Amino acid sequence: THRMAREIREELEKQNFHVVELRMCELRDSDLRDELELADLVLVGTSTINRDAPPQAWHAMSLFSLVTPKAKIAAAFGSFGWSGEAVKLVEERLKGLRFKMPVPGLTLRFSPTDDNLRECREFAGQVAAQVVGTE
């Protein structure tokens, strides 16, 4: 998932987006909340562990309800080994919080191949187009 995030971030930066990458396991709640308030776009990357997103992802997402999602676009992506449910679960949570979700989540099995990294760049381009379309 980290390689996916790096590829997505680099593609967004090529398109002149200011990207703040936050690692949920290393973040204070107040810092996450502050960054969410400033963001036009929220991308959540998560792996699937035991058919779910890890606890750190759910804790971070619990803070999303403190943010007004008006006009905020969100999307999810992640890697999995066997089942891959985490991205869909995260998408459901984001939709429930009323984030706009115009681009389907991206899931990749195991470590990304060169073709998968291309998919990550395409995903970033699709999300970027949605943000640009709302400005």
What are the roles of these predicted feature ranges?
Residues 6-25, 32-135:
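FMN-binding flavodoxin-like domain, especially the glycine-rich phosphate-binding loop
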Residues 1-3:
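Glycine-rich phosphate/diphosphate-binding loop of Rossmann-like nucleotide-binding domains
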